[in-house]
Amino acid sequence: MGNFDIAAMQNIQKELQEKYKDGWGGLSPEKARNQLLWLYSELGEVGDVIKKSGDDKIMNDSDTRRHFIEEMCDVMMYFNDVLLCYDISPEEFEKIYLEKHQTNLNRW
């Protein structure tokens, strides 16, 4: 696998959303709120893996590590859904992300 970036993730999410649009309701600003709530839920699952398994198992136990990464993937999927709901392109996201990075570099 080569470069896996925001554009690739958004394309994957568009495919998934298109497949299930009748049941999930598609992507729109009105749906963003629900996607964000699902993202929070998935973040809680990431936290549960950390709390219940600990750092050492995440780093050294392949099953725990896989479970942790799967939950992080769920977070990223919902994150990308929110971007898509608000029609935020990879280029727009990258521009603002890099600007924010520069701000943070010069903050303290």
Stretches with model-predicted labels:
Residues 1-108:
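Flexible "arm" and connector segments at domain edges
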